[in-house]
Amino acid sequence: MSTNPIQPLLDVLYQGKSLSREQTAELFGALIRGEMSEAAMAGMLVALKMRGETIDEISGAADAMRAAAKPFPCPERNNNPLHNGIVDIVGTGGDGFNTINISTTAAFVAAAAGAKVAKHGNRSVSSKSGSSDLLAQFGIDLTMSPETASRCLDALNLCFLFAPHYHGGVKHAVPVRQALKTRTLFNVLGPLINPARPEFMLLGVYSPELVLPIAKVLKALGTKRAMVVHGSGLDEVALHGNTQVAELKDGDIIEYQLTPADLGVPLAQISDLEGGEPAQNALITEAILKGRGTEAHANAVAINAGCALYVCGITDSVKAGTLLALATIQSGKAFELLSQLAKVSGEALVNGQERGR
């Protein structure tokens, strides 16, 4: 008879049965603490994948990872009457398209337009250049301390939180994920475990089948308001076709579709949004933020920033949000913000504030 306390939970999964939210949190807690063998980890992830993860199981895994995360000292949420919450603009990755860095660039635009954006990101999943790869090109320190990141959020309306810096326990799963060579629950967990605990989210998913389930997970996790989107193959709001949406608002979830026309912009081709290596994508992002990007690039960023501005209540419609985002892009304010963030990041390193992290 096994003395391993998690073995009975694994046995439930191996029988094709579901775990409760609490049971899943217990399993993932063991994984994060390094108390699960790689064989058991692989068995757990495959068993969940083959049956299909439930809302409770995804929520429980997120609970465990949130609880184990390095704390993030959020700026006082109540000291500013205009500051009614933090928003994240994030995608699962894994959509298979090598696009420009839409959500990362949109984060600068939304912040310059007045949103408080704490973007949780990692290195590339589906493209040649993930959010962290891009930021490194601009000299933004990926591992700035939580205190420095919090100051950036307070002063500049924006910070970037590098996932491995806050979720050290995930390293135990890396060899297994690489060996399995298939999507697992970890592919959807990243956007759910932002240590800033954003009240608002624009969350893109790689599959249309995930849109409603992930909206239900966000509701279970206590997210105040969100749009979960899949845009004609992309984990973003689409410029090249329809976007499937599940919007969480006031505890209810409504499903609908958005077209580029609904957002006030013309249709474009997916090929117009093709990205490259980090250095090339950095030049593209810089051009967009200076108001000198191509129409398709500017519009793709604006519709995503616009939906984030709508979700956090700065505008009362996605179309109004897109118009505000386009005006912000043309003003050059978003590029000024990027320059300020890089400056603060560099000063923190020079002053030694990032030591002893």
From Swiss-Prot:
Record GO cellular component, one term: cytosol
Cofactor: Mg(2+)
Reaction catalysed by this enzyme: N-(5-phospho-beta-D-ribosyl)anthranilate + diphosphate = 5-phospho-alpha-D-ribose 1-diphosphate + anthranilate
Gene Ontology molecular function: any one: anthranilate phosphoribosyltransferase activity
Residues noted as binding 5-phospho-alpha-D-ribose 1-diphosphate in the record, renumbered to the chain: 91, 94-95, 99, 101-104, 119-127, 131
Protein's UniProt keywords contain Transferase: yes
InterPro entries: Anthranilate_Pribosyl_Tfrase, Glycosyl_Trfase_fam3, Glycosyl_Trfase_fam3_N_dom, Glycosyl_Trfase_fam3_N_dom_sf, Nuc_phospho_transferase
Cofactor binding annotation: Binds 2 magnesium ions per monomer.
Binding locations of anthranilate 2: 177
Involved pathway(s): Amino-acid biosynthesis; L-tryptophan biosynthesis; L-tryptophan from chorismate: step 2/5
Residues reported in the UniProt entry to bind anthranilate 1: 91, 122
Residues involved in Mg(2+) 2 binding: 235-236
Protein EC: 2.4.2.18
Alphabetical GO biological process terms: L-tryptophan biosynthetic process
Family in the record: Belongs to the anthranilate phosphoribosyltransferase family.
Functional note: Catalyzes the transfer of the phosphoribosyl group of 5-phosphorylribose-1-pyrophosphate (PRPP) to anthranilate to yield N-(5'-phosphoribosyl)-anthranilate (PRA).
Oligomeric form and interacting partners: Homodimer.
Name used for this protein in its record: Anthranilate phosphoribosyltransferase
Gene name as annotated: trpD
